[in-house]
Amino acid sequence: MSSIAKSARIHKLAVVEDGAVIGENVVVGPFCHVGPKVVLHDSVQLLTHVVVTGRTTIGKGTKIFPMAVVGGDPQSVHHGGEETTLDIGENCTIREGVTINTGTADYGGKTVVGNNNLFLANSHVAHDCRVGNNVIMSNNVMLAGHVTVEDRAILGGGCAVHQFTRIGRQAFVGGLSAASYDVIPYGMLNGNPGVLSGLNIVGMTRAGIERSVIHRVRRAYKSIFEGEGSIRDNATAIREEYADCKEAMEILDFIAADSDRALSSPNRGKG
């Protein structure tokens, strides 16, 4: 049996399968289809022609536009029909034609999307991705499987992100770019193949980071990417100097972390 709150509004031309859980003030518009293992928390809106399927949970206040398909099976040759999950946070906006898939059993079985994210038309989040909070994915952005996008990153229209790549917090990936390697926090990546083109100074300023801090982060960036050694050696060498700068340390910790991908840099041959 479904659990449907009394204040929920479900159009007579919508299909809500037995077993679905529908919270207070949820709106399910005409021609929507909600699967039997779906949980829609309070004030979720499915406008029209929206499919929510699989073992999918959608947080409060999220709004989904027509032709989006959320919770579909992972597009992976390794998927054997196992039951996997998708968790979407609160107050996300999921525009027309967006697709977000569940995870795969071999990698924990879960795709996770945080809060306050904006997914513009026809963008795609593949299996096992981790998307943080306040992320903007512009039209036709494609995340391959196992991608991590950290908080407040912005991905420009039509860009593609290679599987297992990490996009750091408040990074910016330009439109039509190919992000084949990890992008540092506050980094700016452009082109195909993608090349690191400096820091996202505009984004840092909008986030309220003080100018003096931005200058220090720029100096750290130059030491890392313009020094004589490798990127990782250079990053290790300056850790003590920047120990009191949270933003610089965030970059250094990102570089030091284990990853399946190399690091994007101004010079792709160096890493």
Curated annotation (Swiss-Prot):
InterPro entries assigned to the protein according to its UniProt record, in alphabetical order: Acetyltransf_C, Acetyltransf_C_sf, Hexapep, Lipid_A_LpxA, Trimer_LpxA-like_sf
One GO BP annotation of this record: lipid A biosynthetic process
Primary location: cytoplasm
Annotated transmembrane regions: none
Any one annotated GO CC term: membrane
EC number from the UniProt entry: 2.3.1.129
Reaction(s) catalysed by this chain's protein: a (3R)-hydroxyacyl-[ACP] + UDP-N-acetyl-alpha-D-glucosamine = a UDP-3-O-[(3R)-3-hydroxyacyl]-N-acetyl-alpha-D-glucosamine + holo-[ACP]
Pathway the protein contributes to: Glycolipid biosynthesis; lipid IV(A) biosynthesis; lipid IV(A) from (3R)-3-hydroxytetradecanoyl-[acyl-carrier-protein] and UDP-N-acetyl-alpha-D-glucosamine: step 1/6
Signal peptide residues on this chain, from the entry's feature table: none
Pfam families: Acetyltransf_11, Hexapep
Cellular compartment(s): Cytoplasm
Origin: domain of life: Bacteria
Repeat in keyword set: yes
Keywords, alphabetical: Acyltransferase, Cytoplasm, Lipid A biosynthesis, Lipid biosynthesis, Lipid metabolism, Repeat, Transferase
Single GO term (MF): acyl-[acyl-carrier-protein]-UDP-N-acetylglucosamine O-acyltransferase activity
Assembly and oligomerization: Homotrimer.
Role this protein plays: Involved in the biosynthesis of lipid A, a phosphorylated glycolipid that anchors the lipopolysaccharide to the outer membrane of the cell.
Family annotation (NCBIfam families): lipid_A_lpxA, PRK05289.1
Family per record: Belongs to the transferase hexapeptide repeat family. LpxA subfamily.
The protein's name in its UniProt record: Acyl-[acyl-carrier-protein]--UDP-N-acetylglucosamine O-acyltransferase
Provenance organism: Rhizobium rhizogenes (strain K84 / ATCC BAA-868)
